[in-house]
Amino acid sequence: MLDISELKSYAKVNLFLHVLNKRKDGYHNISSLLSRIDLCDVITITESSKLEIIYKGLQSKEIVDDNILKLFTLLKEKDLIKNFNYKIIIEKRIPIGAGLGGGSSNVATIINVLKDLNIFKDN
């Protein structure tokens, strides 16, 4: 049985951020320097009968824009992932909405686990 625990998903701070030109797609090019800080969410992944995403801890009830759910929805829509029947528990320690990149860090950490577990289809 798979049990991956104590995955640390670190926060970051922008040491500087310069907004450059606006692109044709409406976004802006930026120049930035980031630094990882010693503050992290902790992620645990265990086998389950279906995909479950559970948030615990600091401000967990305030999560309205679930990046991890968006990730799995996109991967399934694009048919890029095999069945993923796991429970993902995220213990939130990074303050939500503080600009510390907690949600993005959580997604990046989970993508790395998916690669290690060979969950992606060969297409």
Show which residues each predicted segment covers.
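Short, small-residue alpha-helix embedded
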Residues: 104-118
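ATP-binding N-lobe of GHMP and related small-molecule kinases
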Residues: 1-98, 115-122
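Flexible lysine-rich "adenylation lid" loop at the C-terminal edge of ANL adenylation domains
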Residues: 100-102
